[in-house]
A protein has these predicted regions:
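C-terminal and inter-domain tail/linker signature
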Residues: 1-141
């Protein structure tokens, strides 16, 4: 049975390596739009550069799909990304909205995740300020 392009796209993310990034060429549109809390790019080369940058800056990034929902031209994914940075394993939970055209090619991919709790809180100065503000503003049970 032939895989749909969205299935190929998801499989590529779940098995992504620096050498497999080039495989996006066959399943994304030339003018794909991508955004996440740190990036907003348009175009296939810029899209692939996001992932080359990821492999350059974190160790052993892995994606795991936790849940998904599809309709005719859109898929929503709940995912977990794990990687090593800041001297330990990091885990980020997020959601993606992926849109595709009539032929199944991906036209946009928008990631939504909590960058404050996922990344910034682990930075010494920002983490200290955030934890201090939680003591002030969080309701105690």
């Amino acid at each position: 049975m032939k895989k749909e392009p969205i299935e190929k796209y998801i499989d590529l993310f779940c098995n992504l390596t620096i050498s497999s990034i080039k495989n996006f060429d066959d399943i994304v549109e030339d003018n794909i739009e991508f955004s996440d809390p740190f990036n907003s790019v348009k175009g296939k080369e810029n899209f692939k550069n996001i992932f080359y940058h990821m492999f350059k800056n974190v160790k052993n990034p892995k994606f795991r799909i936790l849940d998904h929902s599809n309709n005719k031209r859109r898929t929503f994914l709940k995912w977990e990304m794990s990687f090593y940075a800041f001297k330990s394993k990091q885990i980020i939970i997020g959601m993606s909205e992926i849109n595709y055209n009539k032929t199944g090619k991906i036209v946009s991919h928008h990631d939504y995740w909590d960058s404050l709790n996922g990344i910034f809180i682990k930075l010494p100065f920002i983490g200290f300020l955030y934890k201090a503000s939680l003591k002030i503003f969080s309701m105690k049970n």
